[in-house]
């Protein structure tokens, strides 16, 4: 009986194929991960998180992760789409210290090519702000983000968010309201695109190489 069970046992790993996952074209289609699957259809929808530093070489941003989702497989090669980014909780905690005021902004926005997003921003001021001043800061930030999103495609916005210019631009936007120096777009999430229906797929998360 034991021998029969042994003969009938299959090595599931040997039945799987390893697929190469690549970044979107606006990030050079570089290889970002390898993942096994029994069928290429099972790769669709899998998520991969990659440090921003892997793309920019800026190791100060190694705690910021870009998030991709597999959208198509050809042979053993799988292409992805950008679906957001996130900054580690430890990085945000280090930003906020005692006697500092934290301002959180969570806002919806839309790119010029119709992608809907939620963007989360955290700012830290050196002193407590009045209610009016906080309102001015929020209004300026929301107006700035909506203007940038509305003037960019999703690939352009993704590159902008993970780059260095966005920080300087926000500081410049706020200089006439309050000189806030600690700013982070801590998370972005793509919700969908106008006129498109998202197809369900696997939701496995894959570690980048």
Curated annotation (Swiss-Prot):
GO term, biological process aspect, one: translation
Xref: InterPro entries: Ribosomal_eS1, Ribosomal_eS1_arc
Entry's Gene Ontology cellular component terms: ribonucleoprotein complex; ribosome
Pfam families: Ribosomal_S3Ae
Alphabetical UniProt keywords: Ribonucleoprotein, Ribosomal protein
Residue ranges of coiled coil: none
Residues of the signal peptide: none
Top-rank lineage group of the source organism: Archaea
Ribonucleoprotein among keywords: yes
Gene Ontology MF, one: structural constituent of ribosome
Entry's family note: Belongs to the eukaryotic ribosomal protein eS1 family.
NCBIfam families in the cross-refs: PRK04057.1 (NF003142)
Protein name (database record): Small ribosomal subunit protein eS1
Native organism: Picrophilus torridus (strain ATCC 700027 / DSM 9790 / JCM 10055 / NBRC 100828 / KAW 2/3)
Gene that this polypeptide is encoded by: rps3ae
């Amino acid at each position: 009986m034991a021998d029969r069970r042994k003969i009938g046992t299959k090595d599931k790993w040997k039945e799987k194929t390893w697929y190469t996952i690549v970044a979107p074209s606006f990030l050079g289609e570089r290889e970002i991960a390898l993942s096994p699957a029994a069928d290429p259809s099972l790769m669709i929808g899998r998520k991969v998180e990659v440090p921003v530093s892997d793309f920019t070489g800026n190791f100060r941003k190694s705690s910021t992760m870009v998030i991709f989702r597999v959208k198509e497989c050809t042979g053993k090669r799988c292409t992805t789409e950008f679906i957001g980014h996130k900054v580690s909780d430890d990085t945000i905690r280090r930003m906020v210290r005692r006697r500092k005021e934290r301002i959180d902004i969570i806002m919806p926005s839309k790119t010029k090519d119709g992608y809907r997003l939620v963007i989360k921003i955290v700012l830290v001021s050196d002193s407590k702000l009045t209610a009016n001043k906080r309102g001015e800061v929020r209004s300026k930030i929301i107006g700035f983000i909506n203007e940038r999103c509305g003037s960019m495609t999703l690939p352009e916005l993704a590159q902008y968010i993970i780059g260095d210019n966005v920080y300087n631009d926000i500081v410049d936007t706020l200089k006439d309201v309050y000189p806030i120096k600690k700013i982070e777009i801590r998370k972005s999430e793509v919700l969908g695109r106008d006129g498109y229906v998202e197809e369900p797929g696997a939701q496995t998360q894959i570690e980048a190489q």
